[in-house]
Structures are given as C-alpha cells and as structure tokens.
C-alpha cells in the first residue's frame, strides 16, 4: 500500500500546474543576475557559483522548491482527506509517502530549475574558461576537463539543501497545522 500511495502523490504533484511553474520560477530567479549584470560572471561555471553565493537568490529558491508539495499538502489538510487515507493504510505508510514525495518533488523542482538556468547561461556565456582556480573537493572535475560534471554535482548539492528546507517546512506544518 505504501508504494501505491507514494505513486499517487507523485502523479498528483507531477500533473499539477504549480510543479511546472515552480521549475520555471526557479530558473527565472536564477537568471536574474545574468540579465541585470551580464558582465558579472565570465562563464557558466562562474554564473552558477555567483548565484549560489548571492544571499537573496539562495533564499528564494527553496521557497519555490517547497511550493508543489505544500500546495498538495494544504489541499489535503483542508479537505481532511488524510483521515480516510490513514484509515485505509496506516500512519507509517502515510508519513513515509508524504516524506518521500516532499523530498522528490522539492529536489526535482530545484534541480530541473537549475538545469534550465545552466542551459540559458550556456547560451549567453562559454561553459568554462579556466579563469579561476577550482575549489576542492569538486574542482577536480574542472581540472580534468569535465565542467558539466562539476555543474551537476554543485547543482545536486544545492538541490539537496533546498530539499532539507522543504522537509523542515513539512515537519513544522505537521506539528503546527495552520488552516490558512
């Protein structure tokens, strides 16, 4: 029952309009500094690192990562549908399905949004010019001529941190329910 429950949550989230809008909002937010400050970064790797070091953008993106699951959870909470789900399955299956759905959806929103941003940045700038010394431990990918691997790893790590914040939001909303 747990896998089917999780699968139904994932179908609901992936078919929702807010999931796809959140991905595009993440990409647009990440691309702001390329539009307003086109000379601030020299290549795509530098553009991603600049994004990850700007506090305002780094704080907004986890909100977009939490939107799809939060909307689904709020809809379920308001309609009290979780009572019948828990009655048909059990609390452990329900909590596991909610947790995994939150993790997967928030990771995908952030990661796919960053991939869209990287694609846009790649259209604007070269991939990697070797203009700065790579930072350990992942800079080895840049030294070995694999900048895409470096970009994927750094994007994955940032997406995991956004997932952590989404999970904190889920935990807080489960302990302190708000009807608004």
Where are these regions (language model features)?
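Short hydrophobic/aromatic segments of transmembrane alpha-helices and their interfaces
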Residues: 1-4, 76, 162-164
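Aromatic- and glycine-rich beta-strand/loop motifs that create alpha-glucan
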Residues: 1-22
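Pore- or pathway-lining transmembrane helices of multi-pass membrane proteins that form conduits
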Residues: 21-22, 176-180
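Secretory targeting signals
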Residues: 28-71, 96-174
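Helix-loop-helix units of permease transmembrane domains in multi-pass membrane transporters
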Residues: 72-105
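Helix-to-coil boundary motifs at intracellular loop junctions of multi-pass secondary transporters
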Residues: 76, 174-175
């Amino acid at each position: 029952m747990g896998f089917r429950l999780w699968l139904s949550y994932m179908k609901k989230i992936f078919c929702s309009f807010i999931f796809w809008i959140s991905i595009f909002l993440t990409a647009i937010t990440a691309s702001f500094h390329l539009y307003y400050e086109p000379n601030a970064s020299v290549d795509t790797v530098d553009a991603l690192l600049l994004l990850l070091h700007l506090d305002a953008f780094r704080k907004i993106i986890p909100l977009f990562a939490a939107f799809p699951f939060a909307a689904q959870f709020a809809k379920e909470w308001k309609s009290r549908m979780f009572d019948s789900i828990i009655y048909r399955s059990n609390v452990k299956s329900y909590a596991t399905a909610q947790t995994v759905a939150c993790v997967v959806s928030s990771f995908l929103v952030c990661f796919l949004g960053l991939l869209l941003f990287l694609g846009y940045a790649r259209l604007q700038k070269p991939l990697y010019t070797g203009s700065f010394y790579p930072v350990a431990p992942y800079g080895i990918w840049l030294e070995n001529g694999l900048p895409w691997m470096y970009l994927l790893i750094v994007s994955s790590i940032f997406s995991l941190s956004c997932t952590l914040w989404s999970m904190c939001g889920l935990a807080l909303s489960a302990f302190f329910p708000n009807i608004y």
